[in-house]
Structures are given as C-alpha cells and as structure tokens.
Amino acid sequence: MLSPKRTRFRKQHRGRMKGISYRGNHISFGKYALQALEPAWITSRQIEAGRRAMTRNARRGGKIWVRIFPDKPVTVRPAETRMGSGKGSPEYWVAVVKPGRILYEMGGVTENIARKAISIASSKMPIRTQFIISA
C-alpha cells in the first residue's frame, strides 16, 4: 500500500474538492491512460487494487505508471465514542482526485490489451473514468 514515509503533520483538515485538475491532466509517460471524470478521495487500497488488476491483465510486457499518490491522512474515531476529546487517529491515506486527473498510464502494449486492462482497473475505482490515448 502506498503512503508517505514521513509527513510534517500527523493530521489534516478535510478540505474541499472544487473545480477541475490543472496539474497531472496530460499523458506524459505512456500511450494510454485512465482519466478521472468526477472528484473523489481515492484510498491507497483502491490505487493498489487498480494497479494489480492492470499488471495481471497486461501479463508480460508493457509498463504501468501510477500518477496519483495518497498523501492525505484520514482520521477515524473509535466506535461508540462520545463527542469531543480531540480528533481521531489517522487510519488510512487518500489521494485527492479532481476531474481531469490522470490516474494510471500504460505503454508497450496494443490498444485492445490496454483498453481491457484499464477497464478492469476502472471498475476498482469509486468514480466514473474514461480511457484516453495520447495524441
């Protein structure tokens, strides 16, 4: 699972996901990519599940690039705890994804293999996505 080695602060505010992604919205490594169409928090487990699905489907050959990284800690309070007494402890990590952001890239395989692998990875994602090809 992906997570930062160390962070400056243990806990973060939730923030909000306004607008579209202006960074990381162009294919820069491979030839095919999976692009987000909705804003969401994508957990490190979901990123890993998508990556595994793609590698398993592409078999040998081909290279995969994961273009998002979970750098936001999500805190969770224990069950049946009264209100107050501070913020919960960090439980898992998420990547904040805005519409237009490239999630995965793929190269070194034919288009139909890439399309199949990326469609399986997209089913692991909690958002609507689209398959794009670099111009």
Curated annotation (Swiss-Prot):
Pfam families in alphabetical order: Ribosomal_L16 (PF00252)
Alphabetic keyword roster: Chloroplast, Plastid, Ribonucleoprotein, Ribosomal protein
UniProt cross-references to CDD domains, sorted A to Z: Ribosomal_L16_L10e
One GO cellular component term noted in the UniProt record for this chain: chloroplast
Subcellular location: Plastid, Chloroplast
Coiled-coil region: none
Gene3D superfamilies for the chain: Ribosomal protein L10e/L16
Primary site of residence: plastid
A Gene Ontology molecular function term of the record: rRNA binding
GO biological process terms, semicolon-separated: mitochondrial translation
Similarity section: Belongs to the universal ribosomal protein uL16 family.
Assembly behavior: Part of the 50S ribosomal subunit.
Name of protein: Large ribosomal subunit protein uL16c
Organism whose genome encodes this protein: Panax ginseng
Species classification: Eukaryota, Viridiplantae, Streptophyta, Embryophyta, Tracheophyta
